[in-house]
Amino acid sequence: MDQLAGAPRILVLGGAHMDHRGTIHGPTVPAASNPGHFAHEPGGGGFNAARNLAALGHAVRMISPRGGDADGETVAAAALAAGVVDHPFVYLDRRTPGYTAILSETGDLVIALADMDLYRLFTPRRLLARTVRADLDWASHILCDANLPEGTIEALAHRARDMGKPLAGIAISPAKVLRFRRAVSGLDFLFMNGAEAAAFSGREATNAADWPAILRDCGLKGGAITQGGRDIIAFDETHSLALTPPPVGTVVDVTGAGDAFAAATLSALAGGTPLPQAIRQGAALASLTVSSSHAVIAETMKDVLVTLVGLVDQPRNLA
């Protein structure tokens, strides 16, 4: 059952798979065996965002391709535990996608491998399925990630625009963010990092404050660019902003930080909060996430988040 019927209803389409994260013990030595340990948990940009949105009190539904294997069952159990209504396309003879990341001893990403072939089967035709059409009708807001094929993202953007429903996107990677290029007419907001913004626009910003103008020239109505510990840049049709993220004592694991920022910012925007305050909530949740060994906060962290938002600086208007 969907919770909190009066809250915004958010449909998420995209990645829901297993994350395998290895952390190196000591300095990273390329082209050599490094001592370390592995941790395994459900992940995926869309799924991380969906679970954070549910923890923040929203009614959330998730659509994603999945294999008929133990990993698929683990993802389904995680959705149930998080309060996300799970509507997967299950391919019994296929393997659930997976993401393997190697992190330095300071929690920074060294390299990652994405085994995501199954997502290619989420074709535009899938959007015509009765269950998907019902979920689109149900939703007040839609979020997708770039694990979906380019044609599917474009078709979803057209559908969202025709239905008058806000659509936000998560870039996932510099290679995959290109899948949003043909969807800009129906895309209201795109969450990305600096490398993804450069790939999407085909340009480099000599000054981070140039990103709003560069991305508007690409047709984007709104977006946010995170840059690790440096200023977050965000814009919409009326704002161009820079926000200094709150300091983090110890970075444990950066996995999921961008998804957390997207979820908390979208949560605020969907509730009617203006962009300057929405990105403060996003920055607060991202800082909590990098301080944790998990990609998604527990529901019990909501009170901590409220307190932390109050400690985040006000954003600055860009000239």
Predicted regions span which residues?
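Glycine-rich phosphate/adenosyl-contacting loop at the front of the ribokinase-like
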Residues: 1-65, 70-81, 244, 251, ...
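Short beta-strand scaffold segments in enzyme catalytic cores
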Residues: 51, 98-102, 111, 231-235
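Conserved post-catalytic alpha-helical subdomain immediately downstream of the catalytic base
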Residues: 55, 220-229, 246-318
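Conserved phosphate/ATP/ADP-binding segment of small-molecule kinases
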Residues: 157, 161-166, 171-242, 250
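Structural motif
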Residues: 9, 140-141, 189
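A glycine-rich helix N-cap at a beta->alpha junction
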Residues: 78-94
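Conserved phosphate-binding/catalytic loop of the ribokinase/pfkB sugar-kinase fold
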Residues: 65, 91, 101-141, 146
